[in-house]
Amino acid sequence: ANAVANAVVQIALVLVIGHFAYDVTWPQDWPALLVFSLLGVTAFAALGVALAQAIPNFDSAAAYVNAAFLPLIFISGTFYSTSGEPAVLRGIAEALPLKHVIDGLSGAIVTGKGVADHWVAVVVLVAWFAAGAFAAVRWFRWE
């Protein structure tokens, strides 16, 4: 619940500041924005809880998170199109959740393509949520 509330505030701030300070247009497909925001938050929250069991202490958490997330950011098309990447990296990116969050949000905000146009992204994100939730329930323990 905290992750979703935090995401709602952040998304609202980015949209409002982007619109009024930088003349960015409002999203073209609000329902798709909502769906992909929620799918992204829930998938990454579940994966975060699952990963938390492997982190030995608070001091090392940033190193573990960065080791997992920074490569994901660079191969998933966060900063540039993945079309110029080698086929191997594109294939890896297609299997990972961030690429599909980016595609869904980009469709909702920029192109107006909705959830039906990104059904593969929905399937991939639901699968990552399910895997993360399963791993979290199976192995996470409060100690």
Positions of PLM-derived features:
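Alpha-helical transmembrane segments and their short interhelical loops
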Residues: 2-65, 115-134
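Central hydrophobic cores of alpha-helical transmembrane segments
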Residues: 65-68, 93-95
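Solvent-exposed alpha-helix faces
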Residues: 1-2, 106
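Membrane-interface capping segments at transmembrane-helix boundaries
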Residues: 135-143
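Membrane-interfacial helix-loop-helix junctions in multi-pass membrane proteins
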Residues: 22-25, 76-131
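Small-residue-rich segments of transmembrane alpha-helices in multi-pass membrane proteins
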Residues: 68-75
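A residue-level signal for alpha-helical anchor/packing sites in multi-pass solute transporters
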Residues: 15-16, 50, 100, 104, ...
